[in-house]
UniProtKB/Swiss-Prot annotation:
It is found in: Nucleus. Disulfide bonds: none annotated. SIII, also known as elongin, is a general transcription elongation factor that increases the RNA polymerase II transcription elongation past template-encoded arresting sites. Subunit A is transcriptionally active and its transcription activity is strongly enhanced by binding to the dimeric complex of the SIII regulatory subunits B and C (elongin BC complex). Residues 237-281 form the F-box domain. Signal peptide: none annotated. GO terms for cellular component: elongin complex; transcription elongation factor complex. Residues 221-230 are annotated as: BC box. This is Transcription elongation factor B polypeptide 3. GO terms for biological process: transcription elongation by RNA polymerase II. It holds the Pfam family Elongin_A. Heterotrimer of an A, B and C subunit. Residues 142-161, 391-415 are annotated as: Disordered. Keywords: Nucleus, Transcription, Transcription regulation.
Amino acid sequence: MPETDEEKVRRYTECLMNGIDPKRALKRLYDLNVSPEVFKSADTYQCVKRYESSPELAKYAKRVRDKLLGGRKREKGGGEDDADIEHTALKKAKKEEVNLDEEFAEAMKSGVSAQASSAPRATVDYSKYKVVKRVEVKVEPKPEPVDVHEQQASSSSMSYQREHQKDYAPVVPTCKPSGQPKKAIPQSKSLHADENMFKPRKERQKVFAGRRKRVGEGVSTLVSLCQTVLMSHIDMIDHVGIVPFDLLKPVLDHASTDQLRHILDVNPMLVEDADEMFHEMVSREFPKYANREKSGWTWREMYDRLVEKKQKKENDKLEMLTSRIGKSNSAQSQGRQTMVIDMAHTRVRSKSFFNTVKDSQVKMSATPSALQLSQARKNVKIEGKAQLRTITPRGGGVPSTSRSRSNNNNNMNNGLVVKKTAPLMAKCKKMLKR
């Protein structure tokens, strides 16, 4: 179904009311040919009037307004015709007065020209041109046509405009001019930031650490003064007598756990009231146990039990750590160690030989030193083999292979270990024999 003109008027009026593309809506309303009753039912005049103050949309709004007012004039007809007749009558009276003035001026000119030309003066009746006091005719301004619907909906539209003011239709403030001078607009501190930057440091505001002391805010009561003194000397609190708990509670809130226990031990009448303080301590340090129901125990006992359990757990953990650290240090201290041996082995043997030597507990003889060998080498030719045999260990000669094998086998059978000459020593002996 195509949209009717009435529906279009309502749709464009809603667009103007909500501020949705007002320029297009004003153009479409101007192009529509609809009776004024349709515009009146949709309250289009009020919506158009809002855009007359906008600099961009004032031209289109005035065109639509003139169109709406023109249609209403044609409807009213009779009442406005009477006003037009009165207005035309006033215009005619004014024109007649202007014509009389013009005739008088022409007559005066004609008289002057006649005297100059010395022509016979014509008889002119100047009585009708006698200047009298001009009657001032007050022309009343033409009253603007006021719509009946506008008067009815004035209150509702004004309230709606106040609640829903748009950015494109600013409200011009109506203020009466006053003779008093205007107050200076306070400037922000950021404008003077550059000026303060180039000033010396002495003029700048000093910065202090900590909280600002509250001095002179008000006169404190005697009770509050006493409480502040007690807060700074909690260790000196002893038996308080019949002082109510409400006065001591602000002081006890600042006390440590040991101080609170000492005060409660001295003043047993405060134990029941102070049990809630231990409940708060449990909820703060051990939140898992805060919602338990009391059954024959107090919150102080619960707190002491939990603290003891926590300390025991920490001590066990500390002992475990110390034992681990001690073990690690002892393991690190066992590194490479040097062993001092008094007597070196005569010959280099295999591991199996040393194991057998250990088992058989055979004593090893010391090898000859280099000095002894050098002396023996010098005296070989003189003293001969006898001296060399005295220096070298027993059996130092180089035996034959067959003989040595048979001797070894016999000795092994007897349970004795035969010492073999080292290859380097055998080589030295061969050289000495030569």
